C-alpha cells in the first residue's frame, strides 16, 4: 500500500534545530566527490559556517548564517557530486547530492573546481522531513 508520511511542524522544527545544535560551534560545508554519509568521499572545498551555523527553525526549515568562502580549494578532476554538513571534527551530520541545477545543492560555476579556486555559498537552507 502506497501512502504519504508527514510530521507535525513542531517536530520538524525540533529535528531541524537538532541538526544545527549537533553541528556545534565549528560547522563546515564540504563539497565532495561521490560518497555517502558513512563514507563521505574526497573533499574538494571546505567552507566554514558561522556560530551558530543556522537560525532557529520555522516551518521545519533552518537558514544558514554567514558561510565563509574557501579561497584555496583542493580542486578535483572529477565532478563534485555530494556535499556534507559536518562538525569541525569531521563528523557528518547531513549528506546530500550536488548538481549544476535542480538538486539539493546547485553549483552555478560548474561541478569541476580547480585547485586554488575560491568556492562560495550565497545561501543555504536545510528542511527537515515533511
Describe each model-derived feature in a short phrase.
Residues 1-83, 87-130:
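Small cysteine-rich, disulfide-bonded extracellular modules of the LU/uPAR three-finger superfamily
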